[in-house]
From Swiss-Prot:
Keywords, ordered alphabetically: Endoplasmic reticulum, Heme, Iron, Membrane, Metal-binding, Monooxygenase, NADP, Oxidoreductase, Signal-anchor, Transmembrane, Transmembrane helix
Protein's name in the database: Cytochrome P450 71D94
Needed cofactors: heme
Topology term for the membrane: Single-pass type II membrane protein
Main location (coarse class): endoplasmic reticulum
CDD domains from the UniProt entry: CYP71-like
Subcellular location: Endoplasmic reticulum membrane
SUPFAM superfamilies: Cytochrome P450
Organism whose genome encodes this protein: Mentha gracilis (Gingermint)
Alphabetized InterPro entries for the sequence: CYP450_71D, Cyt_P450, Cyt_P450_CS, Cyt_P450_E_grp-I, Cyt_P450_sf
Functional summary from the UniProt entry: Cytochrome P450 oxygenase of undefined substrate. Not active with limonene, (+)- or (-)-piperitone, (-)-isopiperitone, piperitenone or (+)-pulegone.
């Protein structure tokens, strides 16, 4: 719900809410620095201003420190904005911060949190993560999806060639490609309505991002009734159920897909019947995992490609350098596989630098299971934690000239995004690091290499480099505020 509407509703019920706040509010034991807060809304007013929350929370951290207390409505929250604080939460005290906090959007759209992303830290989560890492999205399985990825990239290249010389919505076309890869990897075949499913997922993600009134005032049943988006989310969930139930039933009947082996849904069906599985896998659990794959896989991958192209267009020398590398390494080849990505060292640095500046998960949500301390500050049990990965990736303590796109920095200092370097955590770290990291990365690197290999790019008439620099919007995958439109020209040497 729009923040201005949120303010109006909160003011209308201020008297009622204040009485609840007096009962519910607990002050931390330590005297943490915190911004001035207002009655009823706490620090919500600091998150109004048109910028994504990670930008605004960085401003708070600069003034009040890397472990900052913010009160969002009646909910006590802590924002971590340094590599040291993130390391405490995601390594030193990892089990204590391995929980996710509940929200209206996640509970409705992620099937009562019966998934991997938003599931509580319990036996169900451990089981699903193990299945995901060892069976569903293992490096071996990611390689087996190679022919699907290549076919969808070839479709993308054809679309670009047909549009040569005219502006193309690159963001939209890359998003379709990513969604179709995920769809075919999940269901083992081209689905009749996979385009509709992709659009439905995008719409669902946009609607489910952010906090509802009930999230900010959990003790108020009245505000829950006034959360109109709650009803919209439930309608969207019913639409998603209808589509996914149809696809799953069709899959049960057809069984074998284009793999000739198991696709993601096949594995989940097999595990559902496995008598050795300790915790039964429900139909909602299967649908939740599929929605996970779309939301954290397809959307995050396509968003990263869009950001990479934007940064390269704003830096022509970097564009020339990476295209020269790609065209030399892939000369004469009709397809590209994961093994060949190892040769493209500068292009991989371009991807890393894009992930540093524009992490797919800019704010990483956690929740403390027990009371503890981080950097000397007391954290009560069941405190909501927001780790600002976006801010950490731009911290001048760790990065020289942090707001500048400079892929060469990764040639100078070895840093990876596998959760070992806490100044660079685009996929999180610890036990809850993104389990689909390898799948998502393949869906970024290979399509980006092909787009750089086949085409020269320029801006549409009337656009300047400055038009490409836009802040992201609130959302699970840090999406851009505006789509990227570019004009492709087939590379002359081809």
């Amino acid at each position: 719900m729009e923040l201005n509407l949120l303010l109006v509703i909160i003011i209308l019920v201020a008297t009622y809410t204040v009485s609840l706040l007096n009962k519910q509010w607990r002050k931390p034991k330590s005297q943490q620095k915190q911004p001035p807060k207002l009655p009823v809304i706490g620090h919500l007013h600091l998150l109004w201003g048109g910028l994504p929350p990670q930008h605004l929370l960085r401003s708070i951290a600069r003034e009040y420190g890397p472990v900052a207390h913010v009160q969002l409505g009646e909910v006590y929250s802590v924002v971590l904005s340094s590599a040291e604080a993130a390391k405490q939460a995601m390594k030193v005290l990892d089990p204590n911060f391995a929980d996710r906090f509940d929200s209206v959007g996640s509970r409705i759209m992620w099937y009562d949190n019966d998934d991997i992303i938003f599931s509580p830290y319990n036996d169900h989560w451990h089981q699903m993560r193990k299945i995901c890492v060892s069976e569903l999205l293992s490096p071996k399985n990611v390689r087996s999806f190679g022919f699907i990825r290549q076919e969808e990239i070839e479709r993308l290249i054809r679309v670009m060639k047909q549009s040569e010389g005219a502006p193309v919505d690159v963001t939209e076309e890359v998003s379709k490609m990513s969604c179709f890869v995920v769809c075919r990897a999940a269901f083992g075949s081209v689905l009749k309505d996979q385009g509709s499913l992709a659009e439905l997922v995008k719409e669902s993600l946009a609607m489910a991002s952010g906090f509802e009134l009930k999230d900010l005032y959990p003790s108020s049943w009245l505000l829950n009734l006034l959360s109109f988006n709650n009803y919209r989310l439930k309608r969207m969930r019913r639409r998603l159920d209808h589509v996914l139930d149809g696809f799953l039933e069709e899959h049960r009947v057809k069984k074998n897909g284009e793999f000739g082996g198991e696709d993601i849904v096949d594995v989940l069906f097999r595990m559902q019947k496995d008598s050795n599985i300790k915790i039964p896998i429900t139909s909602n659990g299967i649908k939740g995992f599929i929605f996970n794959t779309f939301s954290a896989g397809a959307e995050a991958s396509s968003t990263t490609i869009s950001w990479a192209l934007s940064e390269l267009m704003r830096n022509p020398a970097k564009m020339a350098k990476v295209q020269a590398e790609v065209r030399e390494a892939l000369k004469g080849k009709t397809s590209v596989d994961l093994s060949e990505m190892q040769e493209l060292k500068y292009m991989r640095s371009v991807v890393k630098e894009t992930l540093r500046l524009h992490p797919p998960f800019p704010l990483i949500p956690r929740q403390s299971r027990e009371e503890c301390e981080i950097n000397g500050f007391y954290i009560p049990a069941r405190t909501r934690i927001l780790i600002n990965a976006w801010s950490i990736g731009r911290d001048p303590l760790y990065w020289e000239d942090p707001d500048t796109f400079r892929p060469e920095r990764f040639d100078e200092v070895s840093r990876d995004f596998m959760g070992n370097d806490f100044e660079f955590i685009p996929f999180g770290a610890g036990q809850r690091i993104c389990p689909g990291l390898h799948f998502g990365l393949a869906n970024v690197e290979i399509p980006l290499a092909q787009l750089l290999y086949h085409f020269d790019w320029k801006l549409p008439q009337g656009m300047t480099d400055a038009d490409l620099y836009v802040a992201g919007t609130p959302g699970l995958s840090g999406p851009r505020k505006k789509n990227v439109f570019l004009v492709p020209t087939i590379h002359k040497s081809r």
